[in-house]
């Protein structure tokens, strides 16, 4: 008998998830942008599940943007922070997921964004004293620190980091929560986080599905253009 012990990399789809999505593979295939019955059925399912996700993390419906997974969500958070929020500096660590590290490096090379890597201890904990010291200037900054490291399992004190960042109006906080979403209780009505990312395949969902939480105080432009967009709320404006 084979035993699978790599859930930190990906998980099998739960049977109840397969049962839930099966009708939308066979029968309810309408384009959610269409106004006919097939489209309305699909659009309604999207909005119902957007609300379920928002309720799970104590967020608002229009703060949930569906993506193709964690990599797109991380890219959207970092790139839109630079392009739309005028971020000039990214603070992170050298042990982040490549979706964050490689995107930050691209923004450094292409947009001249400064990257500062926080020191980490032998357990992978970032130096938060160093973080506080750096943030004392007035440079528009994105702090991006993963909640749980996918290689060594170090857990970030996310509420403490959020509190540090919230002291500075020029600072935005993004956390890659791909490893902890569904396992950790988030209350975004109380914790001042600007961006969170999630990928369904890490919590027994399908591959190719994820979301980005964007605090409603932030206005972003679409990262990917070229398709008919919903216009009912801010989240739909960014979803294709």
Listing of model-derived features with the role each one plays in the protein:
Residues 230-240:
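Single conserved hydrophobic/aromatic residue that forms the stacking wall/gate
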Residues 1-232:
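Pyridoxal 5′-phosphate
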């Amino acid at each position: 008998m084979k035993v699978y012990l790599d859930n930190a990399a990906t998980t099998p789809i739960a049977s109840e998830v397969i049962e839930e999505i099966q009708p939308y593979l066979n029968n309810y295939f309408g384009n959610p942008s269409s106004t006919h019955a097939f489209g309305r059925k699909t659009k309604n399912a999207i909005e119902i599940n957007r609300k379920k996700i928002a309720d799970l993390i104590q967020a608002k419906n229009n703060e949930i943007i569906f993506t193709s997974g964690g990599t797109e969500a991380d890219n959207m958070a970092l790139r839109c922070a630079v392009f739309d929020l005028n971020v000039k500096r990214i603070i992170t660590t050298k042990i982040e997921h490549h979706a964050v590290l490689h995107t930050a490096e691209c923004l450094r090379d292409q947009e001249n964004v400064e990257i500062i890597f926080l020191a980490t201890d032998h357990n992978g904990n970032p130096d938060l004293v160093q973080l506080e010291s750096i943030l004392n200037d007035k440079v528009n900054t994105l702090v991006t620190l993963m909640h749980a490291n996918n290689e060594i399992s170090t857990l970030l004190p996310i509420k403490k980091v959020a509190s540090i960042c919230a002291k500075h109006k020029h600072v935005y906080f993004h956390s890659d929560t791909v490893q902890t979403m569904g396992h950790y209780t988030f209350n975004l009505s109380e914790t001042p986080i600007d961006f969170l990312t999630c990928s369904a395949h890490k919590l027994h969902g399908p591959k190719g599905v994820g979301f980005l939480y964007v605090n409603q105080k932030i206005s972003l432009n679409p990262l990917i253009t070229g398709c008919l967009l919903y216009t009912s709320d801010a989240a739909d404006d960014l979803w294709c």
